[in-house]
A protein has these predicted regions:
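Serine-hydrolase catalytic machinery in alpha/beta-hydrolase-like enzymes
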Residues: 2-105, 109
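Primarily recognizes the serine-hydrolase "nucleophile elbow" in alpha/beta-hydrolase
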Residues: 108-135
């Protein structure tokens, strides 16, 4: 059993071999990993050696308590939103390192994608990565 710092919906690779790539899909504001995993179900046939991981964001959503948020967008102060996004970035970076370690992948075989707020956090992370990942 693989352990992560997030609750994760996982779509395993179609291949019986160890995954050669991993795609992390980050959901939008108020969503969850199950929502965005539908994309993985569609992409899987084109990427049979790939595992798809869809983490729930770290916070319960301020406007939808059934969903999650990477950081709170309802706050009025930009500096607080930035601070919260940096905390989410740190947590997601830990998760990405866990994925790379668990599947023994080179960062070039990891793609980070997202929808809405998930795209925001994905770009924020990918632009700062020392070892390049795909975004």
């Amino acid at each position: 059993m693989t352990s992560y710092n997030f609750e994760v919906t996982t779509i395993t690779s179609l291949s019986k071999n160890k995954p050669q790539q991993a795609i992390v899909l980050c959901h939008g504001y108020g969503g969850d990993g199950r929502d965005i995993s539908v994309l993985a179900n569609n992409w899987q046939r084109f990427l049979p050696e790939c595992i798809f991981l869809c983490p729930n964001a770290p916070e319960i959503c301020a406007v939808n308590p059934q969903g999650y948020q990477w950081f709170d967008l309802t706050l009025d102060k930009e500096e607080v939103i930035l601070e919260k996004s940096l905390i989410a970035e740190e947590k997601l970076n830990i998760f990405l390192d866990q994925v790379l370690d668990n599947f023994q992948l080179d960062p070039s075989n990891l793609a980070l994608v997202g929808f809405s707020q998930g795209c925001m956090i994905s770009i924020q992370i990918a632009l700062k990565k020392k070892k390049q990942i795909n975004c």
